[in-house]
Amino acid sequence: MLKSTLSWVDFSEHDRDHMLQVIRIFAEPETVDELGIGSVRDALADVLFPGTSTIQTRAAYFLFIPWIYVSLEGRRASARDVAELARRREVQLIDALAASDDTRGVIGIEARSKLKRFPSSIYWNGLGVWGIRRFPGSREQYHRSFASSPVGPGTVLTNDDGEPADGVVRWNWHPALPDPPPGFPRRASFRLRPDDADFLQERIQSSAPNSYLAFLVGEGGIFSPETVLFPWQHPRTAHAPELNRRQLAHARNFSLVMHGAALCYNLLLVEARLALRQTDADEERRDTYVDMLEQWWAEVKAWTRVVQQWDMTSFWATAEQGNPNIHRRTRYFVETWLAFVREHLRGGHPVDRLVRSQRVVDLLKERERQLKGSRARFYNPHALDGWNGRSGADRLNYRWPVVSDIVLDILNGFAEGEFDAATG
């Protein structure tokens, strides 16, 4: 059997970041995008929380990476040497964070020097989106730039005669980047200083001033992530700008409506496998999905007016702000499923009638066939037999677990300054 491998060409870091998110998603059974709606989910997440990704962890990495690279600037070196120097310092950073009093979210805490993808790669695109990274290319291109000429903060661009080119100054990193704390990276912590928090807040609000993320780091206030499980549950959502509230409403509606499609898909798969062989595990799964669908339908009915009046033209316009290339088949699938939900709401039907509708069954089977081809479980007994029993059955949260950590890190950085002032 041929071994499948991935080889990275010189992608933009955004493309690479997206690909790694896809790989991670397919490694996590509960978040697998079985119905091909991930492009819509990610588009909405980019609108709400620009610069973030599911493979990020803590806000301080938006400072750690520039600090490491700024410390390397001002020297002439090969791309390989720069990459190795940066790698060593990132390993030092891992060790320092692992020894700190807050190890949650330390990237590479287990792998250490054997880590395959370092934080500099994970955060590179987000650093550009927030305007912290001014260098316009990929991380590899940045490494190569060291070989052509010593790069450094405030480097003056020159013309072919070696003279200043119109007084242009090239900044690879934002000139207001705070200095690292003493001993970095051998000593490091996720705890932000007030100046760190202020810088990150300013970068978010300047680079994405109309985003919900900008509102959260500015006026959102401290909240409990244990009780705020989705972005629209934030206690200050009602105080957000009208644009953000509209975006959140679209995200909430999409999450609610499409959750039913995912649950229905899982139930139909379990029943298809039970038709081939009876197992206690699958019978328990079937009962679980039936219960989850009942709960979902009760919630949908509670939101009947919202679901029936949901403006899909406005929804797609919002999603297109994050991704203008959402496939027409994805649009068709979403709108057809929504039409079935609305039809059954109008008729006052129980959820079982929706699930047993042949049109619904055909829609889900055809969607899986479009996405998986010969590997579609509805048509491939071997694939069905190897299924783990749960695929993409969770509600869409638009990276909220990661985003909430980043937001709270920044807000707690301001609180740290207030505490120091009060006790000083």
PLM feature spans:
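Non-catalytic recognition/regulatory regions in large multidomain proteins
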Residues: 1-424
